[in-house]
Amino acid sequence: MASSFSGVLQLTDLDDFIGPSQECIKPIKVEKKAGRAAAKIQIEDDGSYVQINPEGAARKLEKAKITLNDCLACSGCVTSAETILITQQSHEELYKILKQNKTENPLEHKVVVVSVSPQSWASLAARFNLIMQDTAQKLTAFFKQLGVHHVFDTNFSRNFSLLESQREFIQRFKRQKEDKKSLPMLASACPGWICYAEKTHGSFILPYISSTKSPQQVMGSLVKSHFAKEKNLKPNQIYHVTVMPCYDKKLEASRPDFYNQEYETREVDCVITTGEVLRMLEQEGLSLSDVDPSPLDTLFGSAVQEEPVGHQGGGSGGYLEHVFRHAAQELFGVHVDTVVYKPLKNKDFQEVTLEQDGNVVLHFALAYGFRNIQNLVQKLKRGRCPYHYVEVMACPSGCLNGGGQIKAEGEGSKDLLQRVEDLYNTVRTERPEEREEVAQLYGDWLEDKDSAKARQALHTQYHAVEKINSGLTIKW
């Protein structure tokens, strides 16, 4: 049976793709003990392993297991979490919870919440030849037919990510003379990039990375904190699923930083990709086109959302544009009507500048794909990086081309990507500063923009992964 997760062979069209390391995925430091050999290993008839100590006592050995946390703490691979068997992060796990809700004691039921990314809406819309609004409403109805209680749009949580990125950049810009690592500020929404940074460049690169949570994890905070309180639920009474264009989002959700120790629950319990949603539809024998529509839910009482609402600035979230416009106005009193991009070597590396009196006062860039990311890091290491802010994404062409998106059938990959981009751009856009509900939540939920509660809910931290030298990593 074919694996439900994508593999390296499925990504060969990404010419700068960095595959998993061929060394041991989980190198283990072996501590030598003094004395003679302590035990022998015996293989039983059932294939199990038994340790026999010098006194003749036997102890059955357990099989080694690799968890998502092991992946995060391991320096054996650079990225591509999709090549690892992720048992607790799949659509089968969602089915398991939905089945338990139908068969177990009602007191043990979970309120199931699904939060869908706009990139996933666009990929599904392209596959079924639907407009974005119909796709969102039909997918909402599909999930609710399965037993999901609430379906949200992560465009809402992205408002917080954009606003916090704007505020953080202003703070960093103002302290750049005192803090040499305050700029350039590097975007933090892409978990593939974060994983690469922590494992490969560690303590050198981490101070430059924005502390703002991604929209997925902000949505996790909203659902397990604000929404839970509104519904008189404990965080562990909610099972929160996100639908994402990227397999690395599964790793992001599994970071210890996003685990609530008090209630023993994660902000996001399960991440499924757009491709896995397609498999769910196929498993149910349904075409999304044939599902009757249902409005999206909102985080505000009984209100419903008739259509997805997006943001300007491209299919990866629009971080560069929003931070650039805000910084131009806040720092230099300049209102930017149109952000003009200047492509450099390719469309995945572009620059944006603001000039005053013939001088460049703001110098921004976007860097998509690992080839461009590596070039960016080398500029930083040589002290030749001219940028104040960089929108960094691991996938060439950004999130709309994520590894978890639906693959092309009967058309070229570039043609499909163009259709997905066109559909994504049909959605009505909004400025996060103008969203009344966002301003309301800053007061009611977070108490204040600068509160400790806001810091905990909307920001995170990163961890350099120490390289482990072990005999198990030797190449023969």
Curated annotation (Swiss-Prot):
GO terms for cellular component: cytosolic [4Fe-4S] assembly targeting complex. Keywords: 4Fe-4S, Iron, Iron-sulfur, Metal-binding. [4Fe-4S] cluster 2 binds at C190, C246, C395, C399. GO terms for molecular function: 4 iron, 4 sulfur cluster binding; metal ion binding. Pfam families: Fe_hyd_lg_C, Fe_hyd_SSU. InterPro entries: Cytosolic_Fe-S_CAF, Fe_hydrogenase, Fe_hydrogenase_lsu_C, Fe_hydrogenase_ssu. The keyword Acetylation does not apply. SUPFAM superfamilies: Fe-only hydrogenase (SSF53920). SMART domains: Fe_hyd_SSU. [4Fe-4S] cluster 1 binds at C24, C71, C74, C77. Gene3D superfamilies: 3.40.50.1780, Fe-only Hydrogenase (Larger Subunit), Chain L, domain 3. The keyword NAD does not apply. GO terms for biological process: iron-sulfur cluster assembly. Component of the CIA complex. Belongs to the NARF family. Component of the cytosolic iron-sulfur protein assembly (CIA) complex, a multiprotein complex that mediates the incorporation of iron-sulfur cluster into extramitochondrial Fe/S proteins. This is Cytosolic Fe-S cluster assembly factor narfl. It comes from Xenopus tropicalis (Western clawed frog). The gene is narfl.
